[in-house]
Amino acid sequence: GKKVIFHGKEWKSLEFNLVKIETDKGITGWGEAFGYTSWKAVKIAIEEMVAPLLIGKDISNIPEVLLTLQKSLHLFGRYGITMFAISGVEIALWDALGKEKNKPIHELLGKKNKDLFKAYSSLFRYGDPKIVEQKCKQSLDDGYQAIKLHEIENNCIEAGRKGTGNLPLMLDTNCPWTYEETMAKKDFLKNMKLTWLEEPIYPPEDYETLAKLNKELGIPIACGENACTEFEFKSMIKQKAATYIQPSVIKVGGIYEMYKIIQHAEKNNISVMPHTAYFGPGFLATLQLASLMKKETYIERFYLDIDQEFYPNFKKAMNGKYKLPSGPGLGIDLDYKRLSKYEI
């Protein structure tokens, strides 16, 4: 099929920043920071900005550590590279703390409400109707009961609906349109019977316009994968920008920041559908947080085969669902030896 192009290059690799911390008690914690083509910048931010603030420090109170990091580094920006770096390290701290206390992270945060989660297959943007339909059918054969497209052309979206049948279909367009362009597609999009329309406009933080679409389009709006910190999500929720918010734990500031976002969303009767287009500690961190949610949620699973799985038992959803692992920390420890040959 067509080559998948990302930021001007053929997309052949998927880079993530794997974060390892070691405590003076000999405990190792693993985290994950957003990478892709920004991985080098995030790596430098972790090494030069975040790590010096933590080495030799007491990390038993992670919420306090998170606040210190955010306050100390705010002059470098409250979202983007800085927050990606903080997120990865903060996840590793929780993993280490859970292992030290021999408890899964969700037990350190609150009361578990569920341990089985519906999953949806999140497809690439293929730009070819035949491939889209084929990938949808393949996802269903693999047990997924819902699918998310990243297409923007009508014929590809129609192919996705055809391949998915009557099961839930989501559409993430990655911010290509204006308000007017989105409204011009209203009848077509409504006919596709979408569960949600994700990030239809640019810029993604134009919450006022998203709120108009959420009210006028007749399709629930989802957004938030590019937002950071609880304060940005509070603004999003206050303006009624979305029916579904989508924080990404490896972007927003880590586990505790996302926990606060979930708490605020549920107080305002907003559903959280986490952004989880990754395979490492960030995926497990999301499951830990999802177990605390009172409202129903979906877990996103990027639909592609990678050369080496972080956690082989989580390669695919079983009968369209993922089960919360029961071990301490993130639930499963990472076997780095299997991954080390992919280090860059």
Where do the model's predicted regions map?
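Catalytic core of soluble alpha/beta enzymes
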Residues: 149, 154-281, 317
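Flexible C-terminal active-site loop/helix
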Residues: 11, 277-344
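N-terminal small/glycine-rich loop or linker at the start of catalytic domains
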Residues: 76, 101-125, 156, 160, ...
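Metal- or metallocofactor-binding catalytic centers and their adjacent structured scaffolds
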Residues: 22-100
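Active-site mouth loops of central-metabolism enzymes
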Residues: 116-131, 173-178, 222
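Structured beta-strand/loop patches that form or line metal/cofactor-binding pockets in enzymes
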Residues: 1-30, 34, 304, 308
